[in-house]
A protein has these predicted regions:
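Short acidic, Gly/Ser-rich segments with clustered Asp/Glu that frequently serve as metal-coordination loops
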Residues: 217-225
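Acidic/histidine-rich catalytic neighborhood of metal-dependent amide-processing enzymes
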Residues: 224-257
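N-terminal hydrophobic/helix-forming segments and targeting peptides
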Residues: 1-218, 231, 251-256
Length: 257
């Protein structure tokens, strides 16, 4: 594993001095100053032996919360060992690193290799994984083209989630929406051959009741084009409300809140 250090702008000069002339020369060559997301790669015999990532300053981090990992996309996929004693910095970087690994590769024949991170002790990796898995579920649902993400597919995603976390799920579909007094859902989707539905997922028995509601209008690619052409490409995101609720539900259930 390649040691990886988080170095703020104010720390850069001392950190380089502690590592000697070779590191200082490398920083000059690579124009590295600790700017947020900047990568300094220290090598021996042409191989990376240590990485420093610019942690920037307070202003930079406020402007770009996850900007610290921006430069990692230029690095080959490998295992990094995070060397960081500040727990808050280590946790924030681990979350940014994990979120930065997202790729929508559902239709890819071969998924590209991904970098891995060894976190220092004290970082709650399970919590980070729960957050990231929920985020990735939301992104996958939104990124899936409309022809593969209709009401039935959205229901299937909810059922998979319910099965994984032993949650209860009920679905009201098509004409039954009128019988159960959900006329607006039925009205919006009745012209499509893909029947509209109300999906309800319930989990947990203790604590205050929290209800999350997300609109899941799955765009029908065979419908009439009533919007300006330039806006049609983003219509697959019209079900993003439901995707966000499912992703958040996954975070909550995976964290056993």
């Amino acid at each position: 594993a390649v040691p990886l250090h988080l170095i703020a702008r104010a720390e850069a000069e001392n950190w380089l001095a502690a590592r000697g002339v070779a590191a200082q020369n490398a920083a000059k060559t690579q124009n590295w100053s600790g700017k947020l997301g900047q990568i300094l790669c220290l090598t021996e015999q042409g191989l990376p032996v240590r990485l420093a990532i610019g942690y920037g300053d307070t202003t930079e981090r406020k402007r770009k919360r996850f900007g610290v990992v921006a430069g990692l996309s230029t690095m080959p996929a490998q295992v990094f060992d995070l060397v960081e004693s500040d727990q808050d910095r280590a946790r924030d970087f681990a979350l940014a690193f994990a979120l930065g690994k997202y790729r929508y590769d559902r239709y890819a024949a071969n998924a590209a290799p991904k970098a891995e991170l060894i976190c220092p002790e004290g970082v709650d990796a399970e919590k980070i994984e729960a957050i990231v898995s929920g985020e990735f579920l939301t992104r996958d649902l939104v990124n899936t083209p409309s022809n593969d993400m209709g009401p039935a597919e959205l229901e299937a995603a909810a059922r998979d989630l319910a099965k994984t976390y032993a949650a209860d799920i009920s679905v009201v579909t098509g004409a039954e929406l009128l019988a159960q007094n959900f006329p607006l859902i039925q009205t919006v989707g009745r012209a499509s051959p893909r029947a509209p539905r109300l999906i309800e997922l319930c989990w947990g028995t203790a604590g205050p009741r929290l209800t999350l509601v997300g609109k899941g209008v799955c765009f029908d690619t065979g419908g009439l084009n009533l919007k300006p052409g330039a806006s049609m490409g983003l219509m697959k995101k019209d079900m993003g409300g439901a995707a966000h609720v499912l992703g958040l539900a996954k975070m909550i259930m995976a964290s056993n809140m």
